[in-house]
Amino acid sequence: CLYNQPLAVGRVMTPVLAMTVVREAAIAAFVPEKFYTVDLELTSGCTASSRRIPEKTVAENLLEACRKEMVATIQRITCKEKSENPPPLYDLTTLQRDANRLLGYSAQQTLDYVQSLYEKKLTTYPRTDSCYITDDDEEMLEELTEELEGFLDIAPEDVDEAVPRTRRTVNREKVTDHHAILPTRSMLQADLDALPKGEQNVLKLIIARTLMAVSKPFRYLETLLTTECAGEEFTAKGKDILEEGWKAVERKVLADILNRKQELTALPNAAENECGILNAELKEGQTSPPKHFTDVICYERGIRNRP
């Protein structure tokens, strides 16, 4: 123990301590391993990558062989339509997770921000473990989301017009004392620029999640291109958007809060049996150790393992 002081560990801290000790031991014992890949820039407009190769000389030999051939044979192209349903409304833990992942806030920071927003009557009660609302709240949420669409300037076609579109957020059995975290109607008239930056960011996450939860699914076409060169397989993946749905809200919020654009890689059509190779490059990588636990991860694991 730090400074050789005894530390009392109760029934709550014991599993957290055990979990942390196991993770730290795994990190301490981890030995990174280098690996190499060969990337081919194809005339079809995409980049295909080889498998991970542990030996550098093998990867270098493959690189030279590809540079000599300068042609890749298309073996197969598979396309599959996929769909991602919108995420549920926020409870405290999922809000803390996203604020940590996107903004670097600790669990306590996020709690402080959302507690302050609640005290200012800008959001509902924050200390909830439910991601749902009850039937009694459905009409309120329906009216609120209509106003939030204009607040975030969301295109109406991105939001689900199913009747009622809020039905997927309703589950009385999963609401205990308090429903999911929502913005309030009074938030729409508030001067949000006067809020501290941390509170502004957390509020934007809550507004965005509220709209995402009632938006259409994200539909896309996933394409996998498999080519062969010098006896080795190379693959490239891409996504073509069919319907952006809730991702439109996520994209807008990420651009606003993080000043970061979210882009998908679409594979161009490769109708020919062969593609020319414009460039072949050797890439070096290294395996990563398990990540250290943060307070947010501990909260998440505690919720997930709760009976």
Predicted features and spans:
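Phosphate-backbone binding and catalysis cores of DNA-processing enzymes
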Residues: 1-81, 175, 179-244
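Polar low-complexity intrinsically disordered regions enriched in Ser/Thr and small residues
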Residues: 48, 248, 276-279
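Polybasic, glycine- and aromatic-enriched phosphate-binding surface used to engage nucleic acids
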Residues: 232-264, 270
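Structured DNA-binding interfaces in DNA transaction proteins
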Residues: 60-200, 204, 210, 214, ...
